[in-house]
Amino acid sequence: MKRIEEVLNVDEVYTMVEEGVTKPLKVRLGNGEEAIVKYPNNNCGNQVLLNEFVCGCIAQEIDINVPPFGVCQLSDEIIETLPYEWGLDVENAGLCFFSKLITSSIPVTFGALSVVDDPSFNLARLIVFDHLICNRERHDGSSV
């Protein structure tokens, strides 16, 4: 997939995603697409936003299939409508990283990927990419 060049606005926030370390948001963007958004001043810091964007660009350059991604704007006005319990305030407004929500996707490990029967899939390229970006999420303990 590819990077979205335009900076999109977050038009609506549906929920906070509890599974993520950064507690990202599930949103509707100005283009009508649903996305997962990592916002500034999250509990992992702002470096996460840059890391996600750079990783997306690297994946795109070496033909790793990733969801469309880019930068979006989360406004003070949207933040102020969110539940107090989420712990977000205007410090979390600003430029964010987003990736389009792919509803049919599932997390996978290298063990599961090793049996993929698709000639267009390149496991070696994915392994190199994961090592390059220090991704440990696909490691299930049974791979090198």
Feature map (PLM): residue ranges:
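Conserved ATP-binding subdomain of kinase catalytic cores across diverse folds
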Residues: 2-110, 135-136
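Conserved kinase catalytic-core segment
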Residues: 105, 110-144
